[in-house]
Amino acid sequence: MKISQIIKTVIAGTLISTSTITYSLYHSEKAKAEVDHYYRDGFQYPTYVTALNKAKKISNKNLSISHYTTTKQSKLKAIGRVSNKNGWKKGSNDPKVRKQDSMGTGTVIGSHTFITNAHVIDDRYGKAAAAKYISFDMNRDGKSVPYHFHASKVIKVPQSDIAVVHTKENMGKHVKPIRIATDKEIKSLKFNSTIYSLGYPWQHNDNTKAYFNRLRFVQFSGNGSEILTKDIFRSGASGSPMLDSKFSKIYGLRTYGYNLDGKSTDQY
């Protein structure tokens, strides 16, 4: 499939259509939020206030995050760690940080295509990094890297924090892509509905291991462009998919939120 066709498919698949229901994160009011140049409708008033009040009605016992080691035997195999060797860390004053990759999570949606957040593949100036700097370790768990793919084309979807990445290798030989949910399926989400995800969050001083999350739907943002959830979300999980219980369709991408470093006095 050509890149232009992929983008049209993504748009038609509701990640960025006029009736878009796309991405987002929701957390406790006690911690700081990620700051970047992308517009976050979930942070706008009064959406933030109403979502917070609703989130307080959802018990923290309904949320979970745990190391996941069985992706080789499941549909979650299509998810992996995205590495950006020319990301925001290149602008750090700390030499050790400059040597690190900027990273996030991606999901295979086509034989040669995965999707992630645009801020994951951005350079320090907010532009898409060249394809040669982007790679995808599908199904990675720590030092176990069964599949390593190289980007051939990186496309940022206009007016959204979404990127479509084309790969040199045919990932479809190794995994079945996960489809993007329809508008109708996304709009069927109700308050406190369970959503599932797998990503590569910063946990125990490491961002190379896969973690499985259970999160809860709170509401759609004011302009209908974002899914607000109550979640245990950490840096590195950006771009991870919001999935149904069968892991068969993507409602959106986990993108931003509070307590990204997990150091808030609030548990989540």
Model regions and ranges:
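Sec-dependent N-terminal signal peptides of Gram-positive bacterial secreted proteins and lipoproteins
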Residues: 1-29
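Protease-domain processing segments flanking chymotrypsin-fold serine proteases, especially trypsin-like
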Residues: 25-103
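Catalytic histidine site
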Residues: 37, 74-135, 219-221, 244-247, ...
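A structural micro-motif recognizing beta-strand termini
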Residues: 83-87, 165-172, 230-233
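A generic structural motif
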Residues: 114-116, 161-168, 227-229
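Serine endopeptidase catalytic core focused on the charge-relay Asp
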Residues: 130-217
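Catalytic nucleophile loop of clan PA
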Residues: 232-254
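C-terminal cap/linker of serine protease catalytic domains
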Residues: 251, 255-268
